Design a protein with these regions (language model features):
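Extended substrate-binding grooves/exosites of carbohydrate-active enzymes
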Residues: 1-171
């Protein structure tokens, strides 16, 4: 027998680290039972942003932070038999009223209209695709108040170099 769980630790329940604890405990108690994640995800809206993303804020940045953690968490638990991100696309959900848009679930990696790929989409592309690419994260986050910002990219390349005004800033 095998089992998969729908868990949203770090989204509905505070604490991304709880995913590691839960998986380790399950494996300790049931060392011979294959474990999978049949649903995991966090809502992210490409029009909501934060320099300090936090659980439940529906920002594109928190959704990316959540998925970054989960992919690394899955790597730390090689005995998982399957993981299933929830969901490829945002979708209608009549009874929902979260994130400022009633009737929608924004856990997708791509918007409901299939037009906008969220930053989290490119995280998975970096992990899984062989197509060469670089994606600059938070590029829709234009109304900022910080003096300095961190530039984050997702890429499947060995290295990426950042230039601004012809000057090399980072590699």
């Amino acid at each position: 027998d095998l089992v998969s769980w729908n868990l949203y630790l770090g989204w509905y329940v505070p604490g991304l680290f709880l995913n590691d604890l839960w998986m380790d405990f399950f494996h300790l108690v049931y060392p011979n039972r294959p474990l999978g994640f049949s649903e995991y995800g966090a809502e992210g809206m490409p029009n909501l942003h934060s320099a300090h993303p936090r659980r439940g804020d529906h920002t594109e940045e928190y959704q990316a932070k959540y998925h970054e953690y989960m992919l690394k968490c899955f790597d730390r638990h090689p005995w998982l038999w399957a993981t299933h991100v929830w969901n490829m696309f945002d979708f209608a959900a009549d009874a929902r009223d979260q994130g400022g848009e009633p009737g929608m679930n924004h856990k997708g990696l791509v918007t409901f209209d299939r037009k906008t790929k969220k930053d989290s989409f490119y995280l998975y592309k970096a992990w899984w695709s062989e197509e060469n690419f670089v994606h600059i994260c938070s590029k829709r986050f234009t109304d900022r108040t910080e003096k300095e910002i961190e530039v984050k990219v997702y890429s499947n390349q060995k290295s990426v170099t950042l230039y601004a005004d012809g000057k090399k800033l980072a590699e």
